[in-house]
Amino acid sequence: MSYYYETEEVNNNPELKSNFPWLADRIHEGRSSIFHALGYVGLKTENAFGWFLSTERKTISTAKNEVFSSDERKLPGVAYVVVGGMAGNIFARNRIAPARWLITSLSTAATFMFCFPKTSKNIGAFVEKRFPAIRKQRMLVLEQTQKNIQNAQKSMTSAVEGVQKHYENAVKKIKGD
C-alpha cells in the first residue's frame, strides 16, 4: 500500500471537545476523509504515471529497434527537414488554410523521405507489419492506380492511332490519291 493510507493521529483540544463535541468530531472526520481521498488520488496518479512511462519506454524501444536507421546522420537530416517544412510554408503563404497545411505537410514529408530514405522505408514496413488493414488498403489503391494507368495508356495509344489515321487521310486527300 501507499504511505497515504497510514492512520492519522490527531490531538484534539480537550477544551474545544468539551464545548463543542460534535464540531471536533466532524472536523476530525473531515480531515480523515480528505486525507484518505487525497491518498487514493495520489496512488491512482502514481499508477497512471507508471503506466505512461512504461508505454513511452516501450514505444521508444520499438522505434529505435524497428524504425530508425542507425547509419543515417540525424542532425543535418533533421535540419533539412525543418527547412523543407518552412519552405513549404513560404510557398503556401497566400493560400487558404487547408491548402497551406497540406502544402507544408507534403513538403515536410517529401524532405523527410529524401533525407532519411532508410528510415522512411522502415516506417512503411513497420506500419504494414503492425497494421494489416492499412497494408490491405494500400494494396487496393496500388492495384486501382495500376489499372487506371493501363487504361490511360490504352486510351492514349488509341487516340494517337486515331490522330495518325486522320493525318494520313488528310495527306492522301491533299495529294489527291
UniProtKB/Swiss-Prot annotation:
GO terms for cellular component: MICOS complex; mitochondrial crista junction. It comes from the Eukaryota. It holds the Pfam family ApoO. GO terms for biological process: cristae formation. This is Uncharacterized protein C1442.05c. It comes from Schizosaccharomyces pombe (strain 972 / ATCC 24843).
